[in-house]
């Protein structure tokens, strides 16, 4: 029999069992695609977490947090941003509207919240202005048969994501790749 490594818990969140380690993972998942209280539950659990991950969704959704810093409406930032010891991650499934994210981040910091530890997946896809335009055009085209879109570009965004024609964060740093991706997207959209 080979050597079995023994891992010990490095913090209050893990438990050593035998020769292995088990970490506590909490996942808050909504089944109704909407306002079920996921944000409130996440906010309560965030203060006892090491990492908070926003793994999907866009700026169309949001939740209100009331804490010692005041009252905040978060749309893209993970709920852990109010706690300095927490790593906050925006995952690859998020519809990343960079302008809205920066505005939300600045708003939180300007109100006295210490700059949060924020990490963005290089595989997060970027929301582009034409996603919002297409969403609005489609809702107008449907008229009374419209589905009640927030007109924030979510459906066209996820369409591009799953058709693999969108732009990921890692691609915006390479001018040639970005140019190719935009050219391909524009060609398909026209």
Question: What does each of the following model-derived ranges do?
Answer:
Residues 2, 10-14, 18-20:
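Residue-identity detector for glycine
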Residues 23-190:
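Non-transmembrane, aqueous-exposed alpha-helical and coiled segments at domain scale
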């Amino acid at each position: 029999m080979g050597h079995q490594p023994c891992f010990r818990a490095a913090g209050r969140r893990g438990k050593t069992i035998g020769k292995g380690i088990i970490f506590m993972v909490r996942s808050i998942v909504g089944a109704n695609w909407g306002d079920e209280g996921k944000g409130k539950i996440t906010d309560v659990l965030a203060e006892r977490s090491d990492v908070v991950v926003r793994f999907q969704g866009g700026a169309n959704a949001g939740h209100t947090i009331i804490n010692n810093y005041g009252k905040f409406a978060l749309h893209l930032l993970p709920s852990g941003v109010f706690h300095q010891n927490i790593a906050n991650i925006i995952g690859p499934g998020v519809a990343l509207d960079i302008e809205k994210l920066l505005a939300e981040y600045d708003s939180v910091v300007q109100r006295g919240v210490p700059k949060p530890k924020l990490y963005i997946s290089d595989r997060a896809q970027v929301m582009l202005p034409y996603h919002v335009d297409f969403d609005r055009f489609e809702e107008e085209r449907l008229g009374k048969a419209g589905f009640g879109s927030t007109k924030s570009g979510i459906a066209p965004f996820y369409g591009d994501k799953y058709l693999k024609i969108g732009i990921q964060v890692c691609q915006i740093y390479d001018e040639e790749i970005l140019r190719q991706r935009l050219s391909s997207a524009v060609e398909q959209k026209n």
